[in-house]
């Protein structure tokens, strides 16, 4: 884990540059930033970015930087024009396997920073922006792997050769607005809210992505505004793609029928020939939470299995039973007992 320590921050002058230090820290793989001067505006700005664009990055201002740096349990790095060349030390720092704190100052860094640091590290031994120095250090530390990190937030920018492609993971209000836009009945809305409630409780125990759980649960039956057949999952996915909803939510909707539909079953049912079996943890939770409700009435697993078996759907019942077992194992409790 890498923590960035920003010192000599002056809220009245350095708001923009410290914001850029924080944004660079987040985007290039650091886990947190500590800032010496209290600055609520800066905290709100960065937390807004995290809320919209995702990640587990954190920010805290008003820290005693000397105490934080001195007592940090790991490797303490000070980025400075006067340090050792980055290429001479970066492998040693990375291969230590220890957490790292990177001190990023502005002008006139106190001598204590140099004395406390385990490594005074320079990028070029020339005057350079602290933002650039931090970006280069993190890139060398992660060896370019930071470009593979996935940030999943409400707003998700997609790679594009030209133009702008943005996909959204809608929040609860936006999901309900979408349902109303497509004419969802009150009965349907009551059902998806019930499913959301259970799915979130399961997600809490499984450390699942709650953004995807909320959106997937609330939108899983949006396709019923077009058809009440088994193809409503496919119809729902089509609606969400047209609304630029993130693929993680689209897949949860498309794969929520029972414990999924195999490619062979899809062909027999007249669905587009592909595999509709839930794969991610979030997809599995949405599917099973839906299985455990008839309308807004909660069912136990055995009741669900009996319904499927009476319809001659024994193999589907077994898949639902296995899905229930898998999620319960992750949750550490039989999800029948989660109320």
From Swiss-Prot:
What SUPFAM superfamilies is this protein classified in? alpha/beta knot, HD-domain/PDEase-like
Q: Do you know which SMART domains this protein is assigned to?
A: HDc
Residues annotated as binding S-adenosyl-L-methionine are 79, 105-109
Q: What is its EC number?
A: 2.1.1.206
* Keyword S-adenosyl-L-methionine in annotation: yes
Q: Predominant location of this chain?
A: cytoplasm
A biological process (GO) of this protein is: tRNA nucleoside ribose methylation
Q: Which Gene3D superfamilies does the protein's record reference?
A: 3.40.1280.10, Hypothetical protein af1432 (1.10.3210.10)
| Signal peptide region | none
The Gene Ontology terms for molecular function here are: tRNA (cytidine(56)-2'-O)-methyltransferase activity
Q: Which UniProt keywords apply?
A: Cytoplasm, Methyltransferase, S-adenosyl-L-methionine, Transferase, tRNA processing
What InterPro entries does this protein map onto? Alpha/beta_knot_MTases (IPR029028), HD/PDEase_dom (IPR003607), HD_domain (IPR006674), HDIG_dom (IPR006675), tRNA_m1G_MTases_N (IPR029026), tRNA_mtfrase_aTrm56 (IPR002845)
This entry carries the following GO cellular component terms, namely: cytoplasm
What is the main EC category here?
transferase
Query: What reactions does this protein catalyze?
Result: cytidine(56) in tRNA + S-adenosyl-L-methionine = 2'-O-methylcytidine(56) in tRNA + S-adenosyl-L-homocysteine + H(+)
Short name of one Pfam family: Trm56
**Which family, according to UniProt?**
Belongs to the aTrm56 family.
Summarize the protein's role: Specifically catalyzes the AdoMet-dependent 2'-O-ribose methylation of cytidine at position 56 in tRNAs.
UniProt name for this protein: tRNA (cytidine(56)-2'-O)-methyltransferase
From what organism does this protein derive?
A: Thermoplasma acidophilum (strain ATCC 25905 / DSM 1728 / JCM 9062 / NBRC 15155 / AMRC-C165)
